[in-house]
Amino acid sequence: MIIFTITIIVMMLATILSKKTITDREKSSPFECGFDPMNYSRLPFSLRFFLIAIIFLIFDVEIALILPMILIIKTSNLMNWSMTSLFFIFILLIGLYHEWNQGALEWNN
C-alpha cells in the first residue's frame, strides 16, 4: 500500500512539473526557415498492409513459441507433449480461420 501511494505521488509530481506552457506549443510545429511547410509531412499508409503486418507478427510469435517444443520432447511424456502441441496448433488454426472468415486476409476490397 505504501509503494502504491509513493508511486501515485511521484506520478502526480511528474505531471505537475512537466506541464507545457502555451509558448512551448510552437516548438512542436513544423518549421522550414520561417515559411509554412510546402507539403504534408506524413505519407499515406495502407491500412490493409498494416493489418496484414499485425497478423503476420501475431502468427510469427506463435511459431516462435512452437519451436522450443521440439527440445521439450526429450524431457516430457510423449502423450502430454503431443496433446499440448495439437492444442497449440489447433488454436493457431482457429485464429487463422477467424481472420480468413472476417476477410482480413483479402487484399482487394
From Swiss-Prot:
Quote the subcellular location field of this record: Mitochondrion membrane
EC id: 7.1.1.2
- Which reactions is this enzyme annotated as catalysing? a ubiquinone + NADH + 5 H(+)(in) = a ubiquinol + NAD(+) + 4 H(+)(out)
EC category? translocase
Q: Which UniProt keywords apply?
A: Electron transport, Membrane, Mitochondrion, NAD, Respiratory chain, Translocase, Transmembrane, Transmembrane helix, Transport, Ubiquinone
Q: What does the entry list under GO cellular component?
A: mitochondrial membrane; NADH dehydrogenase complex
**Alphabetical list of Pfam families matching this protein:** Oxidored_q4
Transmembrane residues, as ranges? 2-22, 52-72, 78-98
The record, for InterPro entries, names: NADH_UbQ/plastoQ_OxRdtase_su3 (IPR000440), NDAH_ubi_oxred_su3_sf (IPR038430)
* Membrane topology of the entry: Multi-pass membrane protein
Q: Which Gene Ontology molecular-function terms are recorded?
A: NADH dehydrogenase (ubiquinone) activity
Q: Which family does it belong to?
A: Belongs to the complex I subunit 3 family.
PANTHER family in alphabetical order: NADH-UBIQUINONE OXIDOREDUCTASE CHAIN 3 (PTHR11058:SF9)
Q: What role is this protein assigned? A: Core subunit of the mitochondrial membrane respiratory chain NADH dehydrogenase (Complex I) that is believed to belong to the minimal assembly required for catalysis. Complex I functions in the transfer of electrons from NADH to the respiratory chain. The immediate electron acceptor for the enzyme is believed to be ubiquinone.
- Protein name per the record: NADH-ubiquinone oxidoreductase chain 3
Species assigned in the record: Aedes aegypti
Gene, per the UniProt record = mt:ND3
